[in-house]
Amino acid sequence: MAKHSTTMSCLLFFVLLCLGSHLAQAQVLFQGFNWESWKKQGGWYNFLHSHVDDIAATGVTHVWLPPPSHSVAPQGYMPGRLYDLDASKYGTGAELRSLIAAFHSKSIKCVADIVINHRCADYKDSRGIYCIFEGGTPDSRLDWGPDMICSDDTQYSNGRGHRDTGADFGAAPDIDHLNTRVQTELSDWLNWLKSDVGFDGWRLDFAKGYSATVAKTYVDNTDPSFVVAEIWSNMRYDGNGEPSWNQDGDRQELVNWAQAVGGPASAFDFTTKGELQAAVQGELWRMKDGNGKAPGMIGWLPEKAVTFIDNHDTGSTQNSWPFPSDKVMQGYAYILTHPGVPCIFYDHVFDWNLKQEISTLAAVRSRNGIHPGSKLNILAADGDVYVAMIDDKVITKIGTRYDVGNLIPSDFHVVAHGNNYCVWEKSGLRVPAGRRH
């Protein structure tokens, strides 16, 4: 009897250890701002601080905060004095530190929006060109001149820098990331954001603006726990204006970047967003590629893919590439139960009043230990229905078709449902929600 009890105890310990490892891997990112957040009376940091408990209740593990520094544009994407946090339109440096501490008290990690492809200068040089930069400190850190601008950015450069390693950004000087002083001082600034301000990871804005080799330098120099890059490529479209079924070239670019940078580096899965927002318009056959896998980055390298429905660019008031508004919850049913790291948008939780539905789906993810590398088995992908099983524990259906025949085993029961989506969970042993990591 004692031997049997010991064996059972060891088995239970092994099961809990395995489940715990899945929970440790499970990640849900929350974008904690939109394009208009800088206008908030009383400051966005203070406003968000008052909602930390609400955000934690959605089950997120990471929160993505806006660019923290002085910027010519109020949203933060035209940065200048990088060390000057008090000039941010979102609030002061002290308010930012307090907000990060509040999230940390809920075991939520904070991701800074890092804009380093380009930078705005404070002063003109002898040519009358704005290319003299101030770092925001009494000393010379990040106090640069035209030598630190890419030589082929002829509007600003003096021609002495290296050529740009990525795409051009026309609205501000493209920084020469092959310059050793640039690399050293930007790495020091990033490490200061970690050690002094409290950030845990980076969201790399316009990462197409510099090479993956450059990105790897900053990731290796700063050892963040989480990194996600914005690599917004143009999808392929057919003659009728619809996205092509095959988007392998688009997702290959994302995979190549993540593999080249290595470590914790991941990329926003723009391919999945594009395919999914077309698919929910009665074309759910799009959600399975020719090899029976998911059509986005999550079909090839899910561990490094961050899926999303909308963000401050594609949605919000910019609305440049929005998900169909009446089908947003179908999108969340997909990304919150599928491989990859799902990202929840602030607007959908608070402005669209979808907090309860999104939280329910996030709880299903946590309870069943769904993680970036979870196993995906697509059971059906027709025009009006998509059904998939994840880790043999969860089944998700999206689409207008109500009857899915015998695709749902008898030992599965409904745990979440809404407008044209439903999620089932396998009966039996449940993974406890536990402490989020």
From Swiss-Prot:
GO terms for molecular function: alpha-amylase activity; calcium ion binding. The keyword NAD does not apply. CDD domains: AmyAc_arch_bac_plant_AmyA. InterPro entries: A-amylase_bs_C, A-amylase_pln, Alpha_amylase, Glyco_hydro_13_cat_dom, Glyco_hydro_b, Glycoside_hydrolase_SF. Germinating seeds. The active site is at D205 (nucleophile), E230 (proton donor). Ca(2+) 3 binds at D153, D168, F169, A172, D174. Binds 3 Ca(2+) ions per subunit. Ca(2+) 1 binds at N117, D164, A167, D174, G209. It catalyses: Endohydrolysis of (1->4)-alpha-D-glucosidic linkages in polysaccharides containing three or more (1->4)-alpha-linked D-glucose units. The record marks D313 as: Transition state stabilizer. Ca(2+) 2 binds at E134, T137, D139, D143. Its EC number is 3.2.1.1. SUPFAM superfamilies: (Trans)glycosidases, Glycosyl hydrolase domain. One of its GO terms (biological process) is sucrose catabolic process. Residues 1-26 form the signal peptide. Its cofactor is Ca(2+). Keywords: Calcium, Carbohydrate metabolism, Glycosidase, Hydrolase, Metal-binding, Signal. Substrate binds at residues 70-72, 77-78, 203-208, 232, 234, 252, 293, 299-301, 312, 318, 397, 402-404, 414-420, 424. Belongs to the glycosyl hydrolase 13 family. Binds starch not only at the active site, but also via accessory binding sites on the protein surface that are important for efficient binding to starch granules and thereby increase enzyme activity. Monomer. Important for breakdown of endosperm starch during germination. This is Alpha-amylase isozyme 3C. It comes from Oryza sativa subsp. japonica (Rice). The lineage of its organism: Eukaryota, Viridiplantae, Streptophyta, Embryophyta, Tracheophyta.
